UniProtKB/Swiss-Prot annotation:
UniProt keyword Cell division present: yes
GO molecular function per UniProt: peptidyl-prolyl cis-trans isomerase activity; protein folding chaperone; ribosome binding
Uppermost EC category: isomerase
Record-stated family: Belongs to the FKBP-type PPIase family. Tig subfamily.
Protein name (database record): Trigger factor
NCBIfam families tied to this protein: tig (TIGR00115)
Any Pfam family matching the protein: Trigger_N
E.C. number(s) listed in UniProt: 5.2.1.8
Gene Ontology CC terms: cytoplasm
Purpose: Involved in protein export. Acts as a chaperone by maintaining the newly synthesized protein in an open conformation. Functions as a peptidyl-prolyl cis-trans isomerase.
PANTHER family hit by this protein: TRIGGER FACTOR CHAPERONE AND PEPTIDYL-PROLYL CIS/TRANS ISOMERASE, TRIGGER FACTOR-LIKE PROTEIN TIG, CHLOROPLASTIC
Domain notes: Consists of 3 domains; the N-terminus binds the ribosome, the middle domain has PPIase activity, while the C-terminus has intrinsic chaperone activity on its own.
Keywords: Cell cycle, Cell division, Chaperone, Cytoplasm, Isomerase, Rotamase
Length: 456
């Protein structure tokens, strides 16, 4: 059989196809069953009947038929009996298994009532012509959650609902600074001024990559450059040439420069200073066209800040209550696979966002001086916390017997459609009913925790 498969793969270029690796071993046929191997781990054994296998074999053959070559037949017109005689039906098994396996596996999981939380490792136990196929799947199941107190929790939060006059003034001042204009300054540069410079950096007299810039605008005191650089330009005037001597931090991302002394020959082209508008009614109207006076702006900003502070306070209470409910619970042997999958999901989401901004993974790691491992480590602690939180909230929803009604699902769809400005039908096509139900019961569980919590 192996030589016939090899012959078939050569005829079809089969090595380029992405197929499940099949591991054959002899065993007696079994019905669907589950064998515990360790806490939250076990093996499912299940069968696939011939009435499922035959259509899958037909699909597998039709998929590759157009590429088949054999003497006496035009390409793509080899009859199935000739194919079976020449290569053997067995060479279709891998493709057929890819077709039929997902549904068969899901059916076995459902029949056994298992809550699987990671990708299974599939092995083929028995795969013989004309007989049902028997497979096994090593699976990781959701851990048991022993709930502690989650109602009437008393929490401490480092947040306040109060908004002071200083908070309002600070918001207006930020807007005032945003409206500032840079004007040429005839005199020495001071902290807060912007200088337009050329610079060339060297270490031991040798220029290095990334150490050169032309017409660069640098705000003194902004911390854009390494420590000590900006301070040495204070007092400089347009036309000056300044030798800036600094030492790269030991933690500098470019390892070949970390901890080394460097010299930057710097030419000052311009010194600019901020011209900030007067704090008056005209400024208020420039900031917000819906107000007429500075006092009107203060009233409006106070309301906005109070609303934001209220939301931040409620979020802090909710976060503290959920964190305490999670701490009060016991999760029995949390599988590492759940953490790994959550880390991978977070990393993939982050890198996807970077690529949408035109930053490839290679470029990101080069710019930040980090590695793929660093990024995974960065998300590990948060992933652990997020997985535990989700498990506890799910357990609370189950303990409370929460369900999602049809009207609640419809309301959730409409809310999401409004939030993301898309048709409700599009939301339905993107999210399954099970996903919507899960979100709704999770919200109900969170409400139980937070609505009964109080602040110390």
């Amino acid at each position: 059989m192996i030589s016939r498969i090899k012959s078939f793969k050569n005829a079809l270029n089969y090595d380029k196809m992405n197929c499940i690796e099949i591991i054959l071993r002899r065993n007696d046929l079994m019905s669907t069953s589950f064998e515990n191997k360790a806490t939250n781990r076990g093996v499912i054994t299940f069968t696939i009947s011939q009435d499922k296998i035959k259509p899958a074999l037909d699909k597998a053959f039709n998929k590759i038929k157009k590429d088949l070559n054999a003497p006496g037949f035009r390409k793509g017109h080899m009859p199935r009996p000739v194919f079976n005689q020449k290569f053997g039906e067995e060479v279709l098994y891998e493709d057929a298994l890819n077709i039929v396996l997902p549904e068969a596996y899901e059916a076995a999981v459902t029949e056994l009532g298992l809550d699987v939380v990671a990708q299974p490792k599939i092995d083929v136990v028995s795969m013989e012509k004309g007989k049902e196929w028997t497979l096994s799947a090593e699976v990781v199941t959701k851990p048991e959650v022993k709930l502690g107190d989650y109602k009437n929790l008393v929490v401490e939060v480092d947040a306040s609902k109060e908004v002071s006059d200083e908070d309002v003034d600070a918001k207006i001042e930020r807007e005032r600074q945003n409206l500032a204009e840079l004007i040429i300054k005839d005199g020495e540069a001071a902290q807060g001024d912007t200088v337009v410079i050329d610079f060339v950096g060297s270490v031991d007299g040798v220029e290095f990559d990334g150490g050169k810039g032309d017409n660069f605008s640098l705000e003194l005191g902004s911390g854009q450059f390494i420590p000590g650089f900006e301070d040495q330009l204070v007092g400089a005037k347009a036309g000056d040439e300044v030798e800036v001597n600094v030492t790269f931090p030991e933690s500098y991302q470019a390892e070949d420069l970390a901890g080394k002394a460097a010299k930057f020959m710097t030419t000052i082209h311009e010194v600019k200073t901020k011209e900030v508008p007067e704090l008056d009614d005209e400024l208020a109207k420039d900031i917000d066209e819906d107000v007429d006076t500075l006092e009107d702006l203060k009233v409006k900003y106070r309301k906005e800040l109070e609303a934001a502070q209220e939301t931040a306070y409620d979020d802090a209470v909710e976060g503290a209550a959920i964190e305490l409910a999670v701490a009060n619970a016991e999760i029995v042997d949390l599988p590492e696979e759940m953490i790994h999958e959550e880390v991978n999901r977070s990393v993939n989401e982050f890198m996807g966002n970077m690529q949408r901004q035109g930053i490839s993974p290679e470029m990101y790691f080069q710019l930040t001086g980090t590695t793929q491992e660093d990024l995974h480590n960065q998300y590990s602690a948060e992933a652990d916390k997020r997985v535990k939180t989700n498990l506890v909230i799910e357990a609370i929803a189950k303990a409370e017997g929460f369900e999602a009604t049809d009207s609640e699902i419809e309301q959730e769809i409409n809310d999401l459609a409004t939030e993301y400005n898309m048709p409700a039908d599009q939301v339905r096509s993107l999210l399954s009913a099970d996903m919507l139900k899960h979100d709704i019961v999770m919200k109900k569980a969170v409400e139980v925790i937070t609505s009964t919590a109080s602040v110390k």
